[in-house]
């Protein structure tokens, strides 16, 4: 939107058509814009007047005296420039507005209007936040920038005066703009121009109403767009439909605006938008709200409000569940007979992130930041008061500290000011140096957004910088040892001189500051490497799954040391040690109810008997890697003694493993994490111990037997195991996990259940469980478990890459470079939705092998996300066909199902049969349930079981989609996850825009949900009905010239329109939901095709339009004569190079029009040194360019002698083109009779890529002017000599004829006279 006015002018002319090309003022303002006024302007203009002047000239007088000269009066006409006043009407911005591009906006000095937030600054109030500001947009949420103590700080606005009538009407307005958000930030860093343009458009469209507009948020949209959200206030309520109609005019008049959506705002959710007092109930209305006292009800309220309360009990059992790195769930109880509406608010510090109301007693929050402390306040109105309670929650993360001492800088006042230019430059350079020092695995985390780095403080001496590194779900064990390699590159920095002694990597101690952890005030905070855990000091922990957060009961008397009840060993008092690089010990505190203290190295502690049986011990981090809940809860009468029980050991990642001895058990978990936990919240199945009280009489050193094994919660990264076993003294279980893709993992536990996470998706794991006691090994149980993922196998043959022996070595640089190019090219050709799945890890591509012939790449596709397998396969096949730089042989490229049954990679138990399906398999129980001691909880053995395809994905589905802001998911306590959500038409239909046809895919689940028969569906005409059908989708296709499909084209876009209908019924009566949905595909006409470097001749390029709806595929080919030019071809100055640019797939009514072609000495199409040879679709004079055809067919051709007017030895060619569709009233042919150069302001922004180059042939100096050869020089000299000789001969002959010929020879007969002859 903020591009140059000339660019937008050309775009708008293209959009409205040539007939409206005059719709602009002389200043470039669009006549379709707002706030335009006519002004009478008087100014001086220059005009030319003809004036006759006389002067005296002396000429010859004539007569006998030739030198005599006489005066003569001579008259001549002179043209003088004079300035005269002229008045005329000029269309310009109205008073109070100024021009910005094509439109009129408020000036920047009125930023208080277009950057303001609702409400007013409080006259008196609490201390503001520490965030300094200059404008309201610098503050989070709805806070305002208010003056306070000589400065300006962010503060909560003052509440409005209470009124009985609605004081205003508020709406959410979402505007989608044709501008890439990153480009917008580059040209407008603070978005001030963007805000004032949106403000002017909205307020002008609603005139004469006095509206107020507040900018809330701008973010990147899909396919190079920007989404802006505004808060619109009107003086009186209007229906949402009326406001939407008024604002919809913006999209019709402003080319850069794609759409405008309007929604009602629930003013009751935001204290800043309603004036209801604490004793009143706020009732939301469309466009407004109503404040209701206890004695009255709103007459216009859509529902009856319960205004009487009998009791006001407090909110109890307020706990947090399912805490992850970006989400959590809160639940509570209220012992009341009334139905209450709860108001839940989430704060980050003093910033209000979200406010919501719900009638349930649970709420899920997603889209949060990792490692951040949040405060959740839940309240309800009762007995005329606000009954509330507050809970503190910190999202999971691993946090580390990096301290850097820089000696070549001094700490100054400007460096302490975070708004100064010096601080910005210093922080940017420092963070860049640290980022460059990251090892590869940490660098990948940083680029993927899973590692957040921030400067915490700057201290003197010279400059000591404290960095805080927050890691979210790294996917592998993360510890200080992982970050330690950054120290050596930092010390070698060329920008900063770093002191080795003052630079270190260490753990971030959350326990030092209460603002860094969420432990209860009645709990100890115990620091761990990368995280922390909490330990209640009371007699009861209300949430054992998150220990130390909700402590109840009496406090245990604090003591300096405690006596172990079993061993009598005195242990020292509790400490909060900090794990740093090189430390191997950790701090462990006793469980609730036991003496306080921490065992020293090599010591053991013995808890009292636990009242639970068959429980699970937490012996490692969970999959969120927080270390919380590391507290141990031992079974029944188990006793922990040093000789017989293993001692805890810590691997470099901070994971605590239990082994018999360190010498014999050094196998680490590597990427696999062990989590033994209670099964309550997670839904895992733990089997009870089969022993009774008599089982305690089992001999102490006899391994127990293992009974039935239950496998549950199988996801793409882990699963849960539980097994039956007798209870015995000194008995442990050893688990061995092996797979073909990772080393074996050995772990020991005394529990009968374990949860494994951090595994690779779609991998078959062999599990062995063995009971041990006193060094003796018992019976072994074996089973197979395959992590969930659908799998495809494929092969692609690449013609223009030669096979190298180095490809046999996967670690060689050539192999890695080729894979990097392959992945980058394939990803760049995938649609945006598929790229999002790949970025989120929902779809993974793994190269299995690279073999000869030319290059054959075999790969696997792992599909974890809830996306159709055929859609993934089709997307990758299309990407292979259109991938740039790589020439793919289509006939030898395929993607097919991966047969797990044939390859024996299924986990079906003996007695069941494996049946292969597309992307997965099923286990069928023929003849009843198998008699096998392994049971899969998600596989009911009744005929054909649902199999992997059913249970592999459901546990992975999140409650909400993580975004940039917190989002609420309203619900109650955990419910069964297998119930499918109801689909709407938008979510069930996917439109695939292809050249020459439109394809619509509809989910069958939606058709079954709405009872819509497949036979009733068609596109515009009944002949274009369902063409393909599988188990999940139906497909409908319509060609561009079939079934009444409409095609419209202008200078900018080609739009194909059809309609999805389902009113086709053989009986003539429709008994189902009727669908009448318009469908359109937009293709961008303006394309840029460049010639640049490639591995082989020819390039296919996909240029998507701004909406990503469709694309045209272009091809550029170079010839000399009829022979195509290979890569890096050399041509001479006299060679005519013929260039063809056109569409890859032929369509008779689509024409290609070249608009501009130029050459550059580098592969950068935007190189400042350019040589234009086609401009405004016509050849530029004196460039030896001849246009053969342009606008006549689906390809354009021209010839040129490129090195006849360019002195460089290497050039790259670039061309812009547009796609044109001929109609009876319009032609695409170009007329170059009235040629003019296209001005810079008329260029159009297009996508770019390079290919080439062309090289001047050897023997010609790169900078020599084009000259004549030696042969031509000889011919010219001879011709000149002949011409001179002939001219001399003619002159001599003429001279003789005019003067006669004299003969002085004496005649012999008469020698007395000389005879004269003429």
UniProtKB/Swiss-Prot annotation:
Extracellular membrane side: 22-1272
Listed CDD domains: EGF_CA (cd00054), FN3 (cd00063), WAP (cd00199)
Membrane topology, from the record: Single-pass type I membrane protein
Principal subcellular localisation of the protein: membrane
Residue ranges occupied by any Fibronectin type-III domain in the UniProt entry: 314-398, 702-791
Record field: transmembrane: 1273-1293
GO terms for cellular component: cell surface; cytoplasm; external side of plasma membrane; extracellular space
Assigned keywords, A-Z: Calcium, Cell membrane, Cytoplasm, Disulfide bond, EGF-like domain, Glycoprotein, Membrane, Repeat, Signal, Transmembrane, Transmembrane helix
One record GO biological process: single fertilization
Spans within the Cytoplasmic topological domain: 1294-1318
Protein name: Uromodulin-like 1
Source organism of the structure: Homo sapiens
Origin organism lineage: Eukaryota, Metazoa, Chordata, Craniata, Vertebrata
Gene name of the encoded protein: UMODL1
């Amino acid at each position: 939107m903020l591009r140059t006015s000339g660019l937008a002018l050309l775009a708008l002319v293209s959009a409205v058509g040539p007939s409206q090309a005059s719709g602009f003022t002389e200043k470039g303002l669009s006549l379709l814009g707002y706030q335009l006024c006519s002004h009478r302007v008087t100014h001086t203009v220059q005009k030319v007047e003809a004036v006759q002047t006389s002067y005296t000239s002396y000429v010859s007088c004539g007569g006998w005296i030739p030198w005599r000269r006489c005066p003569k009066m001579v008259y001549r006409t002179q043209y003088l420039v004079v300035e005269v006043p002229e008045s005329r009407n000029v269309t310009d911005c109205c008073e109070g507005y100024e021009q910005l591009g094509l439109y009129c906006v408020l000036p920047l000095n009125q930023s208080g209007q277009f950057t303001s937030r609702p409400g007013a600054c409080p006259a008196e109030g609490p201390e503001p936040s520490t965030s300094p500001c200059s404008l309201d947009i610098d503050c989070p949420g709805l806070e305002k920038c208010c003056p306070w103590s000589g400065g300006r700080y962010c503060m909560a606005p003052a509440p409005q005066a209470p009124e009985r009538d609605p004081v205003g009407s508020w709406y959410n307005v979402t505007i989608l703009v044709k501008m890439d958000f990153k480009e917008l930030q580059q040209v407008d860093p603070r978005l001030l121009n963007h805000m004032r343009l949106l403000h002017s458009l909205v307020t002008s469209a609603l005139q004469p109403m006095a509206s107020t507009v507040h900018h809330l948020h701008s973010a990147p949209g899909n396919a190079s767009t920007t989404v802006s959200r505004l808060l619109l206030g009107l003086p009186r309520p209007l229906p949402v439909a009326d406001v939407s109609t008024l604002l919809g005019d913006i999209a019709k008049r402003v080319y850069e605006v794609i759409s405008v959506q309007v929604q009602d705002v629930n003013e009751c959710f935001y204290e800043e938008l309603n004036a209801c007092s604490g004793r009143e109930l706020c009732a939301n209305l469309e466009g407004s709200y109503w404040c209701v006292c206890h004695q009255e009800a709103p007459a216009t309220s859509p529902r009856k409000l319960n205004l009487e309360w009998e009791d006001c009990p407090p909110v109890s059992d307020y706990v947090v569940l399912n805490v992850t790195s970006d989400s959590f769930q809160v639940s509570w109880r209220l012992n009341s007979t009334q139905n209450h509406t709860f108001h839940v608010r989430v704060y980050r510090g003093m910033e209000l992130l979200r406010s919501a109301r719900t009638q349930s007693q649970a709420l899920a929050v997603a889209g949060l930041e990792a490692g951040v402390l949040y405060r959740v306040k839940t309240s309800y109105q009762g007995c005329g008061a606000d009954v509330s309670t507050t809970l503190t929650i910190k999202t999971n993360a691993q946090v580390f500290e990096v301290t850097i001492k820089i000696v070549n800088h001094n700490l100054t006042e400007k460096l302490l000011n975070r708004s100064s230019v010096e601080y910005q430059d210093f922080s940017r350079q420092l963070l860049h140096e640290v980022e460059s020092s990251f090892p590869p695995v940490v660098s990948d985390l940083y680029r993927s957004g899973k590692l957040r780095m921030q400067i915490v403080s700057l201290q003197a001496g010279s400059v000591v910088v404290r960095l805080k590194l927050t890691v979210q779900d790294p996917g592998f064990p993360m510890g200080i040892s992982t970050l330690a390699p950054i120290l050596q590159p930092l010390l070698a920095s060329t920008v900063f001189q770093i002191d080795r002694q003052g630079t270190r990597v260490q753990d971030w101690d959350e326990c030092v500051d209460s603002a860094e952890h969420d432990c209860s005030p009645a709990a100890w905070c115990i620091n761990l490497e990368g995280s922390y855990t909490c330990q209640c000091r009371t007699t009861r922990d209300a949430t054992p799954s998150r220990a130390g957060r909700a402590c109840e009961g009496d406090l245990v008397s604090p003591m300096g040391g405690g006596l172990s009840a079993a061993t009598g060993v005195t242990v020292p008092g509790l400490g909060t040690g900090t794990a740093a690089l090189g430390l191997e010990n950790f701090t462990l505190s006793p469980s609730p109810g036991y003496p306080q203290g921490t065992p020293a190295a090599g010591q053991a502690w013995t808890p009292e008997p636990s009242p639970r049986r068959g429980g699970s011990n937490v012996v490692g981090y969970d999959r969120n890697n927080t270390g919380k809940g590391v507290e141990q809860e031992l079974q029944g009468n188990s006793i922990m003694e040093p000789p017989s029980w293993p001692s805890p050991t810590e691997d470099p990642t901070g994971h605590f493993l239990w082994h018999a001895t360190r010498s014999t058990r050094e196998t680490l978990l590597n990427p696999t994490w062990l989590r033994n936990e209670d099964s309550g919240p997670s839904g895992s199945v733990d089997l009870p111990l089969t022993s009774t009280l008599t089982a305690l009489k089992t001999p102490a050193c006899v391994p127990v037997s293992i009974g039935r094994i239950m496998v549950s919660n199988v996801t793409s990264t882990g699963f849960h195991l539980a097994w039956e076993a007798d209870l015995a003294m000194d008995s442990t279980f050893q688990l061995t996990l092996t797979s073909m893709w990772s080393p074996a993992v050995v772990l020991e536990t005394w529990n009968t259940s374990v949860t494994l996470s951090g595994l690779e998706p779609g991998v078959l794991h062999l599990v062995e469980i063995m009971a041990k006691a006193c060094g003796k090994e018992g019976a072994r149980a074996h089973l197979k478990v395959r992590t969930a993922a659908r799998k495809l196998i494929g092969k692609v043959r690449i013609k223009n890459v030669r096979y190298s022996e180095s490809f046999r070595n996967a670690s060689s640089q050539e192999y890695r470079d080729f894979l990097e190019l392959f992945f980058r090219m394939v990803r760049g050709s995938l649609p945006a939705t598929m790229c999002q799945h790949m970025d989120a890890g929902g779809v993974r591509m793994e190269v299995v092998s690279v073999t000869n012939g030319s290059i054959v790449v075999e790969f696997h596709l792992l599909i974890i996300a809830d996306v159709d397998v055929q859609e993934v396969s089709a997307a990758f096949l299309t990407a292979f066909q259109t991938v740039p730089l790589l020439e793919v042989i289509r006939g030898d490229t395929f993607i097919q199902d991966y047969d797990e049954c044939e390859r024996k990679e299924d986990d079906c138990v003996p007695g069941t049969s494996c049946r292969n399906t597309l992307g997965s398999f099923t286990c069928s129980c023929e003849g009843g349930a198998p008699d096998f001691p392994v049971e899969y909880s998600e596989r009911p053995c009744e005929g054909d079981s649902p199999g992997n395809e059913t249970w592999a994905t459901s546990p992975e589905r999140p409650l909400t989609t993580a975004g940039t802001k917190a989002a609420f998911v309203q619900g109650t306590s955990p419910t069964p996850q297998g119930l499918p959500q109801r689909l709407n038409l938008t979510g069930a239909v996917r439109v695939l825009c292809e050249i020459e046809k439109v394809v619509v895919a509809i989910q069958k689940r939606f058709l079954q949900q709405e009872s819509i028969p497949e036979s009733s569906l068609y596109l515009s005409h009944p002949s274009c009905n369902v063409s393909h059908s599988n188990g999940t989708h139906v497909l409908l296709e319509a060609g561009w010239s079939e079934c009444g499909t409409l095609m419209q084209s202008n200078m900018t876009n080609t739009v194909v329109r059809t309609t999805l209908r389902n009113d086709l019924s053989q009986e003539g009566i429709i008994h189902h939901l009727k669908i009448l949905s318009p469908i359109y595909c937009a293709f961008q006409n303006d394309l840029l095709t460049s010639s640049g470097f490639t591995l082989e001749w020819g390039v296919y390029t996909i240029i998507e339009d701004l909406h990503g709806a469709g694309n045209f595929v272009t091809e550029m080919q170079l010839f000399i004569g009829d022979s195509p030019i290979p890569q890096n071809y050399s041509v001479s100055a006299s060679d005519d190079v013929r260039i063809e640019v056109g569409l890859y797939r032929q369509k008779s009514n689509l024409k290609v029009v070249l608009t501009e072609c130029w050459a550059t000495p580098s592969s950068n199409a935007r190189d400042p040194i350019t040589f234009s040879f086609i401009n405004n679709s016509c050849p530029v004079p004196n460039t030896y360019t001849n246009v053969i055809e342009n606008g006549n067919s689906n390809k354009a051709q021209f010839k040129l002698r490129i090195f006849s007017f360019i002195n460089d030895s290497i050039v790259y060619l670039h061309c812009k083109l547009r796609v044109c569709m001929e109609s009876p009233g319009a032609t695409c042919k170009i007329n170059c009779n009235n040629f003019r150069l296209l001005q810079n302001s008329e260029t159009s922004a297009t996508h770019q890529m390079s290919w080439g180059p062309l090289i001047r042939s050897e023997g010609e100096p790169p900078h020599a002017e084009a000259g004549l050869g030696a042969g031509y020089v000889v011919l010219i000299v001879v011709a000149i000599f002949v011409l001179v000789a002939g001219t001399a001969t003619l002159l001599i002959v003429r001279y003789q004829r005019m003067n006669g010929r004299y003969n002085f020879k004496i005649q012999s007969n008469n020698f007395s006279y000389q005879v004269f002859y003429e």
